[in-house]
């Protein structure tokens, strides 16, 4: 008797986190997938990626410009707004939050 393993379908409804970064008193709203064991670790990991990109890549985005003024990533204030199941729902809710909060450092305002 031969058994064949069937591939299970990859989940498409993972948790996403809507977060806020405060850099030099200016705020940024973003969304990221929950990739680490906890929500906080996932958001801190995403903030570290923002910091790395600002230092290593030549992006002229407002967020990157403000992050370059910092000496260490620990100077970034991180807040979690919501955890939402599903990518589409999370991005829709992020737009709603951006409209309410009016963050200064968001340059990509698709949906606003």
Where are these regions (language model features)?
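GIY-YIG nuclease catalytic motif and its immediate N-terminal context
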Residues: 1-41, 92
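Conserved short loop/helix modules at catalytic or binding sites
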Residues: 33-87
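Polar/charged alpha-helical tracts
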Residues: 24-25, 62-69, 92, 96
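Boundary/linker segments flanking structured domains
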Residues: 1-14, 47, 70-112
């Amino acid at each position: 008797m031969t058994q064949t393993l069937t591939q299970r379908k990859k989940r498409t409804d993972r948790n996403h986190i809507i977060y806020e970064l405060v850099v030099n008193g200016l705020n940024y709203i973003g969304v990221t997938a929950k990739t680490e064991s906890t929500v906080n670790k996932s958001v801190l990991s995403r903030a570290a990626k923002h910091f790395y990109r600002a230092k290593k890549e030549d992006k002229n985005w407002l967020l990157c410009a403000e992050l370059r003024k910092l000496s260490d990533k620990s100077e970034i204030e991180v807040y979690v707004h919501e955890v939402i199941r599903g990518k589409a729902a999370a991005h829709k809710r992020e737009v709603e939050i951006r409209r309410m909060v009016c963050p200064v450092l968001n340059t990509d305002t698709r949906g606003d």
